[in-house]
């Protein structure tokens, strides 16, 4: 495994999106593992990995009382239990499974600005930190993100992309267990500066905070969200993934299945209040 990991790490060092992503997380989470370490680790980590530490890590965490087997499909539950027992029944629980006491991030009082150098065309990324994926705030964030950008008729679509004010612009939410993130990204046209693109993106945030958008946009995006969820639920893979996400994020399954009902009741005033609370400069 060591050689592929080193190759992947070396490749990541030349990929601007990866470097930007890691810089964003390091800026938003200076005290949390989301920002203090990366999935691949450092070059120093990969030079001389400890096999003993790897084995101990597996022994500690890869245990039945820290694992979920998520299934969806047309199967006989009785036969499936036998199959699961056959392949996973040998695993022993860790009765001393550690509890992760991770540092809580303090509120950011000023923008954190980082410049990344690389071979790709220049672009700008803006990011805001939110509560984790199991929170009610993340439910609202998903709708807010759709109002801003949905590749058709969001604020960014209508006011930036369709008017060709920048080469491209978009936003999307990033869901994680302890925190979530809203990312906005834009690419400048020839002769346009990154600060100008930043201004365009922030202008759409200001419109959201001021309530300068049609209330029908909220209703339409909620309906689109419903449609997307219905289409996902037609696939066994998507249904099983919902179980996985709920397990990883530590959410109550009852909250998961009623999330759409709550999201459907969101009002424009609630969206505006949410934007003013979290989407500041």
Enumerate the predicted regions with their spans.
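Helix N-cap motif at beta-to-alpha junctions
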Residues: 73-78, 190-192
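Short amphipathic alpha-helical coiled-coil/interface segments
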Residues: 2-9, 201, 221-229
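Zinc-dependent metallopeptidase catalytic helix centered on the HExxH motif
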Residues: 137-139
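Non-catalytic beta-strand/loop surface segments
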Residues: 12-66, 90-135, 146-195, 216-228, ...
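A common structural junction motif
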Residues: 87-95, 202-213
């Amino acid at each position: 495994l060591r050689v592929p990991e080193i190759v992947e790490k070396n490749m990541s060092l030349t990929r601007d999106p990866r470097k930007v992503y890691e810089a964003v997380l390091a800026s938003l989470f200076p005290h949390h593992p989301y920002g203090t370490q990366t999935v691949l680790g450092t070059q120093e980590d990969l030079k001389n990995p400890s096999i003993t530490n790897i084995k101990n890590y597996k022994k500690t965490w890869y245990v039945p009382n820290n694992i979920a087997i998520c299934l969806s499909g047309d199967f006989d539950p009785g036969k499936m239990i036998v199959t699961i027992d056959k392949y996973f029944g040998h695993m022993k629980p860790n009765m001393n499974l550690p509890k992760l006491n991770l540092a809580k991030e303090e509120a950011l009082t000023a923008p954190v600005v980082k410049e990344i150098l690389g071979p790709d065309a220049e672009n700008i990324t803006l990011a805001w930190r939110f509560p984790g994926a199991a929170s009610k705030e993340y439910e609202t964030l998903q709708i807010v993100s759709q109002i801003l950008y949905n590749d058709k008729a969001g604020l960014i679509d209508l006011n930036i992309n369709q008017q060709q004010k920048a080469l491209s612009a978009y936003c999307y939410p990033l869901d994680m267990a302890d925190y979530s993130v809203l990312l906005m990204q834009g690419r400048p046209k020839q002769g346009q500066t990154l600060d100008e693109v930043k201004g365009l993106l922030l202008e759409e945030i200001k419109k959201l905070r001021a309530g300068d958008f049609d209330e029908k946009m909220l209703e339409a995006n909620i309906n689109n969200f419903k449609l997307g969820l219905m289409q996902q639920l037609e696939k066994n893979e998507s249904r099983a993934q919902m179980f996985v996400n709920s397990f990883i994020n530590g959410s109550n399954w009852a909250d998961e299945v009623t999330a759409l009902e709550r999201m459907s009741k969101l009002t424009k005033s609630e969206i505006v209040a949410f934007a003013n609370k979290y989407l500041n400069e």
